[in-house]
Curated annotation (Swiss-Prot):
Family: Belongs to the papillomaviridae E6 protein family.
Gene Ontology CC entries for this record: host cell cytoplasm; host cell nucleus
Keyword Cytoplasm among record annotations: no
Protein's recorded name: Protein E6
Gene: E6
Subunit structure: Forms homodimers. Interacts with ubiquitin-protein ligase UBE3A/E6-AP and thus forms a complex with human TP53. Interacts with human NFX1 and MAGI3. Interacts with human IRF3; this interaction inhibits the establishment of antiviral state. Interacts with human TYK2; this interaction inhibits JAK-STAT activation by interferon alpha. Interacts with host DLG1; this interaction leads to the proteasomal degradation of DLG1.
Protein task: Plays a major role in the induction and maintenance of cellular transformation. Acts mainly as an oncoprotein by stimulating the destruction of many host cell key regulatory proteins. E6 associates with host UBE3A/E6-AP ubiquitin-protein ligase, and inactivates tumor suppressors TP53 and TP73 by targeting them to the 26S proteasome for degradation. In turn, DNA damage and chromosomal instabilities increase and lead to cell proliferation and cancer development.
Amino acid sequence: MARFEDPTRRPYKLPDLCTELNTSLQDIEITCVYCKTVLELTEVFEFAFKDLFVVYRDSIPHAACHKCIDFYSRIRELRHYSDSVYGDTLEKLTNTGLYNLLIRCLRCQKPLNPAEKLRHLNEKRRFHNIAGHYRGQCHSCCNRARQERLQRRRETQV
């Protein structure tokens, strides 16, 4: 992987990094900043889709794999949880409309789309302040959590 010595010239988004390296998302080989494994193709696309930032260690760009994103999101939640608020309260606290706020998923870090934010409002679900940023749950993580709860119930029933 190429080195980017000058911090002012470093691309911080994966598509920009691909442009700088004259490659494509399909062909880039980038390692996870946490576990040091090379990201699989699906993980590269997920990282780009989630609009996450590329980080640099010793001037070398790194991303994060799916497992590490899930794991460190949970760690961040446990260590830095502050409070939870409803959507209308969040709008009043920030003086910004809910649809203009960048709210990421609690688990996978994907930015919530307007439909997912509306789901939080309609179902009276709270947004959680974790390390100074509000988080919710995207549709797929919400369904995954529901499936995990159902599985645990089935396992505990006699």
